């Protein structure tokens, strides 16, 4: 389920190119968009939630610069790593050319105890749904 976005001036640094942390943030937008498209209301999911999903690892690699006005598309795949951890791998395209790739690893914890807990059923279903899309090539 691709996510499309225009690069804004606020996404760029003093040199006029997208700042690396901003592209990671835009990748996170794609993740949130996917959750919403699946029917997970993010506001309700995290409001007084017994679950938190901190990012424990993030990396990004650029193959060419992105500029204000560029329209990008982000595709990502998901991989379940354990009962409480998953990873998203993003590919960022400009006019069908991959210009960057990124990865984020998320862990499910109980926010007060700060201990790992199993992913909630809604996220397990979302992970399964995305895995099915990947397998069928949709």
UniProtKB/Swiss-Prot annotation:
Keyword flag Ribonucleoprotein: no
PANTHER family (alphabetical): 4-HYDROXYBENZOYL-COA THIOESTERASE FAMILY MEMBER, ACYL-COA THIOESTER HYDROLASE YBGC
Keywords: Hydrolase
Lineage: Bacteria, Bacillati, Cyanobacteriota, Cyanophyceae, Oscillatoriophycideae
Stored HAMAP family: DHNA_CoA_hydrolase
GO biological process: phylloquinone biosynthetic process
Catalytic residues in the record: 13
UniProt catalytic activity: 1,4-dihydroxy-2-naphthoyl-CoA + H2O = 1,4-dihydroxy-2-naphthoate + CoA + H(+)
EC number: 3.1.2.28
GO MF entry, a single one: fatty acyl-CoA hydrolase activity
Protein name, as recorded: 1,4-dihydroxy-2-naphthoyl-CoA hydrolase
Free-text function comment from the UniProt entry: Catalyzes the hydrolysis of 1,4-dihydroxy-2-naphthoyl-CoA (DHNA-CoA) to 1,4-dihydroxy-2-naphthoate (DHNA), a reaction involved in phylloquinone (vitamin K1) biosynthesis.
UniProt KW Hydrolase keyword: yes
Pathway: Cofactor biosynthesis; phylloquinone biosynthesis; Quinol/quinone metabolism; 1,4-dihydroxy-2-naphthoate biosynthesis; 1,4-dihydroxy-2-naphthoate from chorismate: step 7/7
Family: Belongs to the 4-hydroxybenzoyl-CoA thioesterase family. DHNA-CoA hydrolase subfamily.
Gene3D superfamilies associated with the record: Hotdog Thioesterase (3.10.129.10)
A Pfam cross-reference name: 4HBT_2
InterPro entries with a match to the protein in the record: 4-hydroxybenzoyl-CoA_TE, DHNA_CoA_hydrolase, HotDog_dom_sf, YbgC/YbaW
